[in-house]
Amino acid sequence: MVPNTPFLAAFSYTPRVRPGAVRALAAQVRHYTTPIDPSIPESKRKFVPCSGAYPLGFRVSGTHVGVKKSNITFPDLAIICSEEPCSAAAVFTTNKFQAAPVQVSKQIINARSGRGIRAVIANSGCANAVTGKGGIQDAKSMSAKVDQCIGLKATGNDGDSSTLVMSTGVIGQRLPIEKIISGIPTGYANLSSTHTAWLKTARAICTTDTFPKLLSRSFTLPSSPDRTYHIAGMTKGAGMIHPNMATLLGIICTDAPIEAPALQSLLAHSVSRSFNSISVDGDTSTNDTIAVLANGVAGGKPISSPESPEYTAMQSILTSFTQSLAQLVVRDGEGATKFVTVRVRNSPSHSDAKLIASTIARSPLVKTALYGKDANWGRILCAVGYTQGISPGTIIPERTSVSFKPVDGSPELKLLVNGEPEAVDEERASAILQNEDLEIVVDLGGGDKGEAGKGGEDGVFWFCDFSHEYVTINGDYRT
């Protein structure tokens, strides 16, 4: 069953893989060779893969059907289909106005207890959110049409449906459902397992994204060290990004064998440490869905017990993978020029560290200062000080320190040490802020535990800056 309670974890996590437990190959993040999609900004092309290691038994397609009138070129209908029934798990937005596809996909997974899922269909250009009973029927029609193409009974009943539905785009408008339904057979006929097909499918779920977000990895598990498994995922999101998730769609596929209850637990764990640890603008959307499908085609013993070495290994793999996907979303934040990691150290608890990091990440004053390359650490400290919901004694001003950590590995630039301001080298600060990547470190010194609390808990958040372009993009969004 899909939990109805918020799944945002209160602490961060950096996976540590035991030697021999998992061998994860590097993510396929490489520079484009040829051809180069001219629509992708040159600065973003390094994040688009030129090849991939995709899971067995999955085929995908991206098709243009014209959901949004202004889109006359790019694919806007994605289909991801497995040759075999899958275990499936999903996590959804906690926004009270949950879009029709969110409601329908929840019902499908619940009715099937996460078993027997065959496909995902997703459209961009229209969110199908706040569209009443008609919107619910449209989402069900999309699911049923894919089931029909697969050759399954398509009754429209939740228990019979095997296709999850996702939508993203403008809220409050009905889908051009005739275009979508008529385009589904074409998309199904074009299903392919090639890298080009995966990339085109990732492009089909984009809205204001400037590049398709696609990753793939290969790995092994302790019980089958000679057997290679694969995981691939695509995500979209550039604005309205803040936990509990936001305008985020994510589709992850693996050929590893994982039982549905274990898969749901694995996904919830990984999302709390990845997609729920990012922020672009602090807004939470109506449509967020992250789904993972496991078809087991690569063989091996199914993962079921949380106590097993395979479960532990898969947890590390999935968490690392979703973190990489989530960070691509931040790198494509609307109008963003900076990718910022904020790390809160030596907190009495994970939850307090995460709350403080989250508060810094969504501060407009911090984000605009970073855009202006201004080492205004007072704004960071201010955000730390007004963080709501933390335990008493977490923040002791005279034990708090702030610094910038450069990407080149050089020593941290200390801005505040134990509550005392440092004489900041403005020239070095300016040089650090010229870089695209930056880490802000806030050390709480153990809070009211003092020296005894040092070496305590960390919290991590990833976010971007605010630029003039962010306002322009969102001011013109519906046009």
Curated annotation (Swiss-Prot):
Subcellular localization(s) per the UniProt record: Mitochondrion matrix
Site entry (Cleavage), positions: A246, T247
Record-listed substrate binding positions: T207, K236, T247, E334, N474, T479
Site (Involved in the stabilization of negative charge on the oxyanion by the formation of the oxyanion hole): T168, G169
Pathway: Amino-acid biosynthesis; L-arginine biosynthesis; L-ornithine and N-acetyl-L-glutamate from L-glutamate and N(2)-acetyl-L-ornithine (cyclic): step 1/1; Amino-acid biosynthesis; L-arginine biosynthesis; N(2)-acetyl-L-ornithine from L-glutamate: step 1/4
CDD domains noted in UniProt: OAT (cd02152)
GO cellular component annotations of the record: mitochondrial matrix
Residues the record marks as active site: T247 (nucleophile)
Keywords associated with the record: Acyltransferase, Amino-acid biosynthesis, Arginine biosynthesis, Autocatalytic cleavage, Mitochondrion, Multifunctional enzyme, Transferase, Transit peptide
Catalytic activity from the UniProt record: N(2)-acetyl-L-ornithine + L-glutamate = N-acetyl-L-glutamate + L-ornithine; L-glutamate + acetyl-CoA = N-acetyl-L-glutamate + CoA + H(+)
GO molecular function: glutamate N-acetyltransferase activity; L-glutamate N-acetyltransferase activity
Protein name: Arginine biosynthesis bifunctional protein ArgJ, mitochondrial
Native source species: Coccidioides posadasii (strain C735) (Valley fever fungus)
